Curated annotation (Swiss-Prot):
Its EC number is 3.1.26.11. The keyword Nucleotide-binding does not apply. Binds 2 Zn(2+) ions. GO terms for molecular function: 3'-tRNA processing endoribonuclease activity; zinc ion binding. This is Ribonuclease Z. It comes from Bacillus mycoides (strain KBAB4). Keywords: Endonuclease, Hydrolase, Metal-binding, Nuclease, tRNA processing, Zinc.
Length: 307
């Protein structure tokens, strides 16, 4: 599991930062990539990374402001042009379906893969399978905006191979049957129960990715005990009133959410273009005063998520 930040700016592109898009690489977990927001020129940013459009399985849109969605039509079309054939699902607030369908229709863009568009109308679980569960809550922004909590389900423990070898059990099909939890009778009549030969499960990771938001309780709830919290930090602490007026957060407010939620790690993104050069480091300094394990994302930077 790895984050690749494709765009970390706020509002409009700048020389140093493109607008919002985050790839969550789940190559080991499911051989796919999930994308969170898709601002203008996201597909161009992808060219500089290891992200492959054909592997994008899901796109989660936080809200419908242009700096979070204007890259969608181009990416969807290019994915088809580049040979993508597997199903892609887009999740987002009401209106995302109309935006995509009109853009594809007017531009006569035809996608050759199954495209599903899921409009989120209420809080709760928007996706769940045997590996992951994605929950969403409304945040506090000028238009409807969602945050996403991605929960990796606990992973079955490893087969205790040394224990089996110590009992004289030779590697082979019996190992797989035991790992699958079956009760197996060996040729010598010994009966082995699979559950006795499986180590403790590995706890799944929790990732929280928030859209644009004021400081709010929903952010804390989504981030509770997260391994990684990705939070916007559009403004410095001295501009807290301006952040409130424009429905955004300061770096210190993001750190406060991480602290209250008992998150393990905080990554700041959605940085205003007013913070050019090294001035953005002041945002990092302010956040670390409250929450030491804070990092600030820059375009094309990757962050692995360890177990």
């Amino acid at each position: 599991m790895e984050f690749v930040f494709l765009g970390t700016g706020a509002g409009v592109p700048s020389k140093g930062r493109n607008v919002s898009a985050i790839a969550l690489q789940l190559l080991e977990e499911r051989g796919q990539t999930w994308l969170f927001d898709c601002g203008e020129a996201t597909q161009h940013q992808i060219l500089h990374t290891s992200v492959r459009p054909r592997r994008i399985e899901k796109i989660f849109i936080t809200h419908l402001h242009g700096d979070h969605i204007f890259g969608l039509p181009g990416l969807l079309g290019s994915r088809s042009f580049q040979g993508g054939t597997t199903k892609l699902t887009v999740y987002g607030p009401k209106g995302i379906k109309q935006f995509i369908e009109v853009a594809l229709l007017v531009s006569t863009t035809h996608v050759k893969y199954p495209l599903e568009i899921v409009e989120i109308t209420e809080e709760g679980i928007v996706f769940e399978d045997n590996e992951f569960c994605v929950e969403t809550k409304r945040l506090s922004h000028g238009i409807e905006c969602f945050g996403y909590r991605i929960v990796e389900k606990d992973i079955q423990g490893a087969l205790l191979v040394d224990k089996l070898l110590g009992m004289g059990v030779k590697p082979g099909p019996v190992f797989k049957r035991l790992k699958d939890g079956e009760v197996v009778e060996l040729e010598n009549g010994t009966v082995l129960d699979g559950k006795d030969f499986i180590g403790p499960p590995q706890k799944g990771r929790v990732i929280t990715i928030l859209g644009d938001t004021r400081y709010c309780e929903a952010s804390r709830e989504l981030a509770q005990d997260a391994d990684v919290l990705v939070h916007e930090a559009t403004f410095a602490a001295e501009d807290e009133q301006q952040a409130y007026d424009y429905f955004h957060s300061t770096s210190k407010q993001a750190a406060s959410i991480a602290l209250q939620a008992n998150a393990k790690r905080l990554i700041l993104t959605h940085i205003s273009s007013r913070y050019q050069g090294d001035t953005y480091k002041e945002l990092l300094k302010e956040a670390r005063e409250l929450f030491s394990n804070t990092e600030i994302a820059t375009d094309l930077k990757s962050f692995p998520v360890e177990r």
